[in-house]
Amino acid sequence: MTDQTYCDRLVQDTPFLTGQGRLSEQQVDRIILQLNRYYPQILTNKEAEKFRNPKASLRVRLCDLLSHLQQRGERHCQEFYRALYIHAQPLHSHLPSRYSPQNSDCRELDWGIESRELSDRGPMSFLAGLGLAAGLALLLYCCPPDPKVLPGTRRVLAFSPVIIDRHVSRYLLAFLADDLGGL
């Protein structure tokens, strides 16, 4: 297995990074400032001004920056990846060089990040479901046992443990045990 250098990875990732909408202007500016201001200083002030020139298009500036870093050597490319990780972590995790068959070590390091991600529904979906369940429980608790008010509710809830997890079904069956005898 051959180890890819950071310069090789940058050559492989350049078309992906320069693609439309991948990096915003603010992210590119932050990366350039990171390479210019923090130790080790990769870009001089003059180079940073050149790559931050608002008169040139973002794609041209980014292509110039990446080719400049490739010419400067391995350390410069490594610092670019470090700055990219800091300022555009979601993009960094989807780079083509991280998923190439030559670079299987990155796959081993990447599995932990994906396992901690939330589902695409997010926390509001969880809170909405929890609120719905709490509201239904409160309605059943406060509702009088008059059969005219909710005639089929107890029958529907009697079959819901089939769908609900077994831990919850124990409590639901215990709650309904008194009312099932009268059905």
Swiss-Prot record:
GO cellular component, one term: mitochondrial membrane
Membrane-topology descriptor: Single-pass membrane protein
PANTHER family associated with the record: CASPASE RECRUITMENT DOMAIN-CONTAINING PROTEIN 19
Paired cysteines (S-S): C7-C77
Localization per record: Endoplasmic reticulum membrane; Mitochondrion membrane
Transmembrane segments: 122-142
Statement: the UniProt record of this protein carries the keyword Mitochondrion: yes
Role this protein plays: Plays a role in inhibiting the effects of BCL10-induced activation of NF-kappa-B.
Highest taxon above the source species: Eukaryota
Domain CARD positions: 8-99
Matches recorded under Gene3D superfamilies: Death Domain, Fas
Species in which this protein is naturally found: Mus musculus (Mouse)
Quaternary data: Associates with BCL10 by CARD-CARD interaction.
Name the UniProt record assigns to this protein: Caspase recruitment domain-containing protein 19
